[in-house]
């Protein structure tokens, strides 16, 4: 490989579980581009030094994952509208010697939902979002942008209220125990919690309460099909698996470093699915 070929990364702590190297190196190979993408483990106390010295380390940019996204936002010289709105960065790049940051999570969510459930926006009812972490914030922003009324529920209500306040109280916050009533009129259900992930407790929800035309999106992709998605499919509901968001948020980031917008193909999806299945 050419010594000057661009190098990009995904940084987190821990990071061994990341599928991002599979995704980006697949695109580099398929597009015939010189470059390399690698996982880098950086502990929180060392992150600022890492991010502020990317060029010296030979990187053109990279992805940022837990627990560094909010810290990254505070370190960039320039941030996109999406990053400023979410106060978190998942994509870094160097431009004219300055560190830039973006957040592609909202875009990734919408692309995945549009792909899996075309026409979902026309379904009446509110979007019920479960959880109050960084992913929930990005998804609430995306749904507001599409003109959707959002109902937000989290096991710790105060965290959901903090997200609602961030968006000018646009999402309506409800107690977790009130979810059954909210599901009865929901057009979209999105799980952003870790419930249902391998090694975590299940998400105890009755999808039979949802209207027959509702769509269910679970951002958990380990396992590829959660119990929530299986139950929704069994009822005949349309579902959007979590892997789609992971793949689609990666595409605009790749374009920042390698100047080409890649496509999310069935072949790429199968490649990542196979890697996840091996780890289950």
Curated annotation (Swiss-Prot):
GO terms for biological process: amino acid biosynthetic process; aromatic amino acid family biosynthetic process; chorismate biosynthetic process; shikimate metabolic process. One of its GO terms (molecular function) is shikimate 3-dehydrogenase (NADP+) activity. It catalyses: shikimate + NADP(+) = 3-dehydroshikimate + NADPH + H(+). Transmembrane segments: none annotated. InterPro entries: Aminoacid_DH-like_N_sf (IPR046346), NAD(P)-bd_dom_sf (IPR036291), Shikimate_DH (IPR011342), Shikimate_DH-bd_N (IPR013708), Shikimate_DH_fam (IPR022893), Shikm_DH/Glu-tRNA_Rdtase (IPR006151). Gene3D superfamilies: Leucine Dehydrogenase, chain A, domain 1 (3.40.50.10860), NAD(P)-binding Rossmann-like Domain (3.40.50.720). Its EC number is 1.1.1.25. The active site is at residue 69. NADP(+) binds at residues 131-135, 154-159, 219, 242. SUPFAM superfamilies: Aminoacid dehydrogenase-like, N-terminal domain, NAD(P)-binding Rossmann-fold domains. Pathway: Metabolic intermediate biosynthesis; chorismate biosynthesis; chorismate from D-erythrose 4-phosphate and phosphoenolpyruvate: step 4/7. It is an enzyme of class 1 (oxidoreductase). One of its GO terms (cellular component) is cytosol. Keywords: Amino-acid biosynthesis, Aromatic amino acid biosynthesis, NADP, Oxidoreductase. Involved in the biosynthesis of the chorismate, which leads to the biosynthesis of aromatic amino acids. Catalyzes the reversible NADPH linked reduction of 3-dehydroshikimate (DHSA) to yield shikimate (SA). Homodimer. Belongs to the shikimate dehydrogenase family. This is Shikimate dehydrogenase (NADP(+)). It comes from Methylocella silvestris (strain DSM 15510 / CIP 108128 / LMG 27833 / NCIMB 13906 / BL2). The lineage of its organism: Bacteria, Pseudomonadati, Pseudomonadota, Alphaproteobacteria, Hyphomicrobiales.
């Amino acid at each position: 490989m050419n010594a000057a070929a661009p190098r990009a990364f995904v940084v987190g702590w821990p990071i061994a579980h990341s599928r991002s190297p599979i995704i980006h190196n697949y695109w580099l190979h398929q597009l015939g581009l010189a470059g390399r993408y690698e996982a880098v483990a950086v502990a929180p106390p060392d992150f600022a030094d890492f991010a502020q010295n990317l060029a010296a380390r030979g990187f053109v940019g990279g992805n940022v994952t837990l627990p560094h996204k909010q810290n990254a936002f505070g370190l960039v010289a320039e941030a996109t509208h999406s990053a400023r709105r979410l106060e978190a960065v998942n994509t870094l790049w160097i431009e004219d010697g300055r560190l830039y940051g973006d957040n592609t999570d909202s875009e990734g969510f919408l692309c995945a939902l549009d792909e899996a459930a075309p026409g979902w926006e026309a379904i009446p009812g509110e979007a019920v979002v479960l959880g109050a972490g960084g992913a929930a914030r990005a998804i609430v922003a995306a749904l507001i942008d599409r003109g959707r009324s959002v109902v937000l529920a989290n096991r710790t209500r105060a965290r959901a209220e903090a997200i609602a306040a961030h968006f000018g109280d646009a999402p309506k916050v409800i107690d977790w125990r009130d979810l059954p009533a909210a599901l009865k009129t929901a057009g979209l259900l999105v799980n952003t919690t870790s419930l249902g992930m391998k090694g975590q407790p299940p998400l105890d929800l009755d999808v039979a309460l949802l209207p027959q035309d509702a769509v269910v999106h679970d951002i958990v992709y380990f396992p590829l099909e959660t119990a929530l998605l299986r139950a929704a499919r069994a009822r005949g509901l349309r579902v959007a698996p979590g892997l789609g968001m992971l793949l689609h948020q990666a595409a605009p980031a790749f374009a920042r470093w390698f100047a080409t917008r890649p496509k999310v193909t069935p072949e790429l999806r199968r490649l990542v699915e196979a890697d996840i299945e091996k780890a289950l």
